[in-house]
Every structure is written in C-alpha cells, then in structure tokens.
Amino acid sequence: MRERIANLSRRELLKLFGISVGTSLAGEAAWPRKIQAQSRKVTPRKNVRNVIFIQNCGAMSPPECLDFKETRFTAKDLDIQTVNSDFVISKAIFPNYEKWAPRATLVRSFYENSLVHSSAQYHTQAGRALNAAILREIPAFGSVVAYELESERRSSDTFPTFVSFDLWNARCPQIGSGMLHPRFSGLDINTASVFEAFGAGEDDSAAKNSVLAERWEVLGRMSEVSPSGGIGGKANEYKAHYEYAYKILTDARFKKVLNLSEQDKARYGVSKDRGTCKIGLAMLLARNVLAADAGARFLWVANTYNGGNGPADNHDQLYGRGALAPKGAQLSIYESGPRLDAAFSSLIEDLSKMPGKEPGKALLDETMVCMVHEFGRNPEMNTNGGRDHWGPCFTNLFMGGGVKPGRIIGKTDGYKVTDVGWKFKEQPMIDHVVSTIYTALGIDWSKKIVDTPSGRAYEYQQTAPLGGPAFIPSTPIEELFV
C-alpha cells in the first residue's frame, strides 16, 4: 500500500474518487449565496440525521417487483409471497425480502415526464427537469444538502457531507455543484478502483504518511508562488477536491471504511457479482462511511453494474436465462433482483443493529433510506421479451428514520394511477422525493437562491419547471411520516 500511496498521480487520485472536474460553475461560484425562504408556513421536520439514496439505474420493472401485477406475460416460477394486504413480492427475485419488505413503505403513484435514461437520471440527480439553458449552474441536490448542512459540521469532520458511490458509471454521471462552491460537489468513490489504489485499509505506516505529507506540502508551495490571479475557478475546483482527498487519506477512519471482511462481502453478494461496479461493495462502503461518523450524512449509491443505462434496462429477455440471458450492461430479473436484494437486505439488517448517535436508537432509526428509479416499465411485454420505458406510473421505496413502516401510498392498475395516495390531484415526482429529503434533514424546501449567474432564481423545489409538467405542488410527501 505504501507504493500505491506514494506513486498516486493527480489523474489517478481524481479517477479513484470518480471526480468530474468541469461540472461546476466554479468561476462564478459564491459562498455564501443569497437565499430567501418563499413561505413562512414551512417548518422542516428534521427527523433524521442521515440519508442513503439508492439509485436503481435502468428502472427495475414494477410489474415483477414493487407493484406486482400477474398477467399473461408473468413467469410462473416467481414464488409470490404476501408481505401485507397490499404488498406481494417474488421470493425468486428477492430471496431475502423478509429482512426489509415488512419495514418498507412504497409510493406507487410516481410520474416521470422524460422517458430517456440520460435526462431522467439527470432529473433524479438534480431534483428537477433538464433545462439546457441553465444546465451549468444547476447543482446536484446532494450539493444543496451539503451546502445547507455546512453549519452543522464539526471540527473533527473530514469526510464531505455528500459522498456517492459509482455515479461515474451511470448514464448521467455526477453533475457537480453548479453555481455552488466546489466544496459542495461531494466525492464519488469508484468501487472498481478504490481497493486497488488503497488495498483493504492495511499499512498505516509512518513512511507512507510522510510521503503523502511531503507531496501535499510541495503542492501548497506551488500554489503560494503562482502568479497573482493565476489560479482561476477551475484550479480552485481542483484544489477543493484535493483538500477533500487529503483530509480523507490522512484520517484513520478512512482505512477502517475500506476494511471489509470476507464474511461481509459474502453476505452482500460481492463474490457473485460480475459487474465492473459491485452493488454489494457500494452498500458495504456506504454502511462503513456512515458508521465512521466522520462528516458524511448524505450518501448516494448508484446501482450501475457495467455502466450504460443500468442493469435493469430490460428491453429484451427480462426473464432470460442461460443462452438467452442478457449480456453486457443488462441483467435478467432473475439476476438483477437477487444481486440487489443480497446487498440491500444486508445493509438494512446491519443498520438496524448498529448503534446510532442518540441513546437507544439504531443507525437505521436515524437514517432515511430511499430506493429510486428514473421511471417505470411498460405493463405490456414487447416482442423481444422485455418491457419498454413507462412514465404514467411507477414505484419508489422508503424506509428507516422518520418513515412509518408498512404503508402503501397510491394505487395503480399497472397502466395508470387509480389513487394518487396523497392530498393533491397531481402525481408525485422525483421533485417531491427531494423536498421530502430536505424536510427530513431539517432543510426548508421552499427556499430559493436569487443571485444566480443567469439571473433566474433557483428554487429548491420547482413548481412550474421548463421541460416538466405545467404545475408541481410544492410539498414533501408528508404521507410517509404521518
């Protein structure tokens, strides 16, 4: 490991963390920005300390998974089990469902306007529809979380508030901090290279730390002798990422994060995962990062497998096995389901046993867990044995801190919503997932940033977005909590 650290180049360091320098409007970033609350009636709940956001890339099929509908297309070997009166589930797809399904609350009435993976995944990450005119100034909503929680950081916090895993491998990679300062971009940890670069948390030698300190000192001296005004916005962005990386690399807690037992890796399904990015590793690292209590409070896990649109983009051979099994970036439901289930069930099981910060509470009690898809899947099977994209209705999952367990919000007939499940006539969208996360963390979702580069106010949750529906209610999904 000493050689790995000593010889780590700038390019390798950026690759390790999956940092996308160039996605922030660093030259025009200000700290702090001018922010106004748009409503005096908003009182954020502030009922969780952390959030784990799981992006299930590709959009797993609701008719087989979280909104099961038996039709003439349905396979006969799914082994359907009853979780509650409104929730049945396939044990063939989710073998460990008993560890998480009874605690989960499902919202089945979601709507998505964009049915293209790149723009829909952008919507998921930005919390708003894609608007090319102001693309560069829009931050990831994880960056907004980091910006808002900055005042709560402690002197001992070295990990950034916003940490993601394998977003670099998604159809829409990390979009950065936009108009916000680059310090809020967060770090995206590349599970395909982090262990190669740093081993498994071993070798905390003085020699290794000395080499790293010497290189950091040289970098600092180079900055000091740079010509006045020579360090621009982009250089400052690199500097901010280097500072994050250096603090993490010199923190003993980072070594512990990477120290994964073979038993844990087996439970999380790592050994069976053939993907470039293994979802079990991402969830294990998310567990350890959260348990380290080193400043990271908003964790994003991207289920990307071999890249592309994601493992669940099943336009063909949804039930394919053997010679008919999908190749490359996709997996059949018989593979993608158990792969996700092994990691997710183990994560929930571990968080429910690990102590939280408050006496008598588990880490799961203090952590809201969301599993989100960019859109749904057509209830009709196509001629290739797959399901195409579907926006009229789909399901997302919520559990953990603050969320009332075992609820089903909204109903569908597979094709359309028959009951939206909340007090508005409009269907909930990813925008409302974002405002729900904001209120849970104690953030006023009605705020807006007024001093933007374009001059257009940036609303934390839009109500009339370009590229989206005519109107979106400004609200969290309160039904998750009451």
What are these regions (language model features)?
Residues 1-482:
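Ligand-binding pockets and gating/stacking loops
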